[in-house]
Amino acid sequence: MEEEVPGFYGESGKSVQATLSSLKMLDVGKWPIFSLCSEEELQLIRQACVFGSAGNEVLYTTVNDEIFVLGTNCSGCLGVGDIQSTIEPRRLDSLTGKKIASLSYGSGPHIVLATTDGEVFTWGHNAYSQLGNGTTNHGLVPCHISTNLSNKQVIEVACGSYHSLVLTSDGEVFAWGYNNSGQVGSGSTANQPIPRRVTGCLQNKVVMNIACGQMCSMAVVDTGEVYVWGYNGNGQLGLGSSGNQPTPCRVAALQGIRVQRVACGYAHTLVLTDEGQIYAWGANSYGQLGTGNKSNQSYPTPVVVEKDRIIEIAACHSAHTSAAKTQGGHVYMWGQCRGQSVILPHHTHFCCTDDVFACFATPAVTWRLLSVEPDDHLTVAESLKREFDNPDTADLKFLVDGKYIYAHKVLLKIRCEHFRSSLEDSEDDIVEMSEFSYPVFRAFLEYLYTDNISLSPEEAVGLLDLATFYSETRLKKLCQQTIKQGICEENAIALLSAAVKYDAQDLEEFCFRFCINHLTVVTQTSGFAEMDHDLLKNFISKASRVGAFKN
């Protein structure tokens, strides 16, 4: 059974509840906009939300509880005080220290964010009062929304195209914004400028989960019933008709079925029952209902995925894509997938539903707040890396240039053929090493623990010598890759000499080509003047064969 992070699960368009199991398998690298971030920045990310008309905006939090934004900044949706786009992450100073419990976004876009303290902040597009601050001015910075919410703790938020919902800890729903089709649930079609509690049939109900389509709203109550209101032109309310609904109405066709979660696409709806079954209704022009055809459905219709129990459903109000995950870990997708209409659930190779939206949805936006918080449990590789040069657990010390490097005999024997033989019958706990320098030998031992090397291109030449001496083929390849990154006209001949000396043929060819391409400058360097006679002779001969000396 999956354990949830604080708050309800709510697939509300882009609502934000993530499970601890999903924390282990989310990969922001699948979202193109993160290519603008450095490796160092990516390593600090704790949560992330990709939004915008083309997946061209992102908000993310770091392990230091700082919030950063990046992208085109339409309508000031980045909240940085202006409408300038940015390819460099900018920090939201006004929210520093705030922990996000739930986050959603609209089409403008506008942002609604709930903190773990139960506060609500909004910013961005506001032409329809979807920010809930009583105005229609775009919000360039986060604004604390407290009207009618001052004594409430908000635990979940959801955004439609231009309207907003929040769910409080006592099971109440508040709504505001665009209301042309009754999506605010007030009984009229007048826009709602500030938060207003949604009552009617929800008056004495305890709501557990909320969601928004483009212009409709959904709520699941603690008894498993589903209540719907707003636009219904495609049957997305599941009431058997196409008339709009200005106040909450129970989906009677689900009588006797206990629903746990609801998710809304652009104009279609998915629900997940307590028995792990999916029902869908609404627009189906892309096959997003998964029923095997493209006919709209105004009543809940079963979606057959596989015999395994479904534990997660996914949809977002800006897309016509649907996804689900089974208890066995299988992920399925259907609907609009990169221009194709997939009319039945298709088994993917993904391990989480988030990847479906990163790779196949249009636009490629997140359907919930991604969480990339690292798991406390270390992998085997991480544990080994941590133990490198650790005197508390080591049973062997190498003395190099007067400095100790701490290691573990069993690991060295497993990882290196040389140590397997040299340490086989040895009872020594100190080994003096004079053949190689301290930086080079330490880098070698670290490689045995991590599979990576951390040396400058110049120092990597020494490690290449060691790799050749110990017949470490993979290490030799890594050294060559590192050395290539540091080549220049001044050191090209020296690196070529090293490549020849250590029989690094790939590096030798690379250095030779570099020298030929920069021949005039290279032949004027001190390295060329001091070049070994035999090497010089071979270089000139080979250069002549490739036409380097032609007029």
UniProtKB/Swiss-Prot annotation:
<dbReference type="GO" id="GO:0048565">
    <property type="term" value="P:digestive tract development"/>
</dbReference>
<dbReference type="Pfam" id="PF25390">
    <property type="entry name" value="WD40_RLD"/>
</dbReference>
<feature type="domain" description="BTB">
    <location>
        <begin position="394"/>
        <end position="457"/>
    </location>
</feature>
<feature type="repeat" description="RCC1 4">
    <location>
        <begin position="223"/>
        <end position="274"/>
    </location>
</feature>
<dbReference type="GO" id="GO:0001669">
    <property type="term" value="C:acrosomal vesicle"/>
</dbReference>
<dbReference type="InterPro" id="IPR051625">
    <property type="entry name" value="Signaling_Regulatory_Domain"/>
</dbReference>
<protein>
    <recommendedName>
        <fullName>RCC1 and BTB domain-containing protein 2</fullName>
    </recommendedName>
</protein>
<feature type="repeat" description="RCC1 1">
    <location>
        <begin position="64"/>
        <end position="115"/>
    </location>
</feature>
<keyword id="KW-0677">Repeat</keyword>
<feature type="repeat" description="RCC1 6">
    <location>
        <begin position="328"/>
        <end position="382"/>
    </location>
</feature>
<dbReference type="InterPro" id="IPR011333">
    <property type="entry name" value="SKP1/BTB/POZ_sf"/>
</dbReference>
<dbReference type="GO" id="GO:0048535">
    <property type="term" value="P:lymph node development"/>
</dbReference>
<dbReference type="GO" id="GO:0001889">
    <property type="term" value="P:liver development"/>
</dbReference>
<dbReference type="Pfam" id="PF00651">
    <property type="entry name" value="BTB"/>
</dbReference>
<keyword id="KW-0968">Cytoplasmic vesicle</keyword>
<dbReference type="InterPro" id="IPR009091">
    <property type="entry name" value="RCC1/BLIP-II"/>
</dbReference>
<dbReference type="GO" id="GO:0008283">
    <property type="term" value="P:cell population proliferation"/>
</dbReference>
<dbReference type="InterPro" id="IPR000210">
    <property type="entry name" value="BTB/POZ_dom"/>
</dbReference>
<feature type="repeat" description="RCC1 5">
    <location>
        <begin position="276"/>
        <end position="326"/>
    </location>
</feature>
<feature type="repeat" description="RCC1 3">
    <location>
        <begin position="171"/>
        <end position="222"/>
    </location>
</feature>
<feature type="repeat" description="RCC1 2">
    <location>
        <begin position="117"/>
        <end position="169"/>
    </location>
</feature>
<dbReference type="GO" id="GO:0048536">
    <property type="term" value="P:spleen development"/>
</dbReference>
<dbReference type="InterPro" id="IPR000408">
    <property type="entry name" value="Reg_chr_condens"/>
</dbReference>
